[in-house]
Structures are given as structure tokens and as C-alpha cells.
Design a protein with these regions (language model features):
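Short, surface-exposed glycine/acidic/tryptophan-bearing loops
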Residues: 27-74
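A short alpha-helix/helix-coil micro-patch that ends at or immediately precedes a cysteine
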Residues: 1-39
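Residue-level preference for nonpolar/small residues embedded in alpha-helices
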Residues: 3-4, 47, 85
């Protein structure tokens, strides 16, 4: 899902920010979260813990983190455009606090579930 990290980079470049570096740990957390939001479309995990425990459970260290979630979009470009049209999601994409990104996508019943996981 590398292209999922490409489109936020374009948005950041337009805003005069450095692109986010792809991160394997953040991507692994994003993949876990994309599967989980099928059960519970929330930043709280199905077990009741915060979404950020998906990264810490994997041993990913970070000082700051953020998450964007979505479903129903068919392409990385469409989902990023949807996030950019939402103030809270746009803040995550354009935050100078984040330096790395991981993107996850999971398909269930013909519907795509998306997660962006940001760390800094």
C-alpha cells in the first residue's frame, strides 16, 4: 500500500511540508487497525483500548501518533481526498509533529476499510 503514503506526501508538499517517510511498524499497525474497524469503526479498538496500542503492542516506539480511518473509498487517492476534506483528518496529514506513516487497507464484503497511522 505504498501508494497510500504517496498521496499524503503530495498534500504535504503543497503545504510546504516534508513528505512522511514510510515506516514498517506504522504500516503493520495500520493493517491491524484496518481489519479492526470492520468490527468497530472507532479510534477505540474492539478490546476497548486506544488505537495507538496497535503500534505499542508491536514494539513501535513514538513520541506522538495519530490515526485516520475511513471506509467505502475505492482508491488511495479517493480516501486521501476524503480525509483532506475533513478538518480533523487534514490536521493529521499536515501535522509537522509526524515524520512517518503507515497505511493499511482491508477488504470485507466488497468494502474497503482504510487506516493511516502517523508517528513522530
Amino acid at each position: 500500500m505504498r501508494e497510500g503514503g504517496h498521496y499524503p506526501g503530495q498534500c504535504r508538499k503543497k503545504a510546504g511540508l516534508k513528505a512522511l517517510d514510510p515506516d514498517t511498524g506504522a504500516a503493520d499497525a495500520a493493517h491491524i487497525r484496518a481489519k479492526e474497524i470492520v468490527q468497530s469503526f472507532s479510534h477505540t479498538r474492539p478490546d476497548g483500548r486506544t488505537c495507538f496500542t496497535a503500534a505499542s503492542d508491536l514494539g513501535v516506539s513514538y513520541r506522538t501518533a495519530g490515526e485516520n480511518i475511513a471506509y467505502g473509498y475505492q482508491t488511495p487517492e479517493q480516501v486521501v481526498q476524503g480525509w483532506m476534506n475533513s478538518e480533523g483528518h487534514r490536521k493529521n496529514i499536515l501535522s509537522s509533529s509526524f515524520t512517518k506513516i503507515g497505511v493499511g487497507c482491508y477488504e470485507k464484503g466488497g468494502v474497503l476499510y482504510w487506516s493511516q497511522f502517523f508517528i513522530g
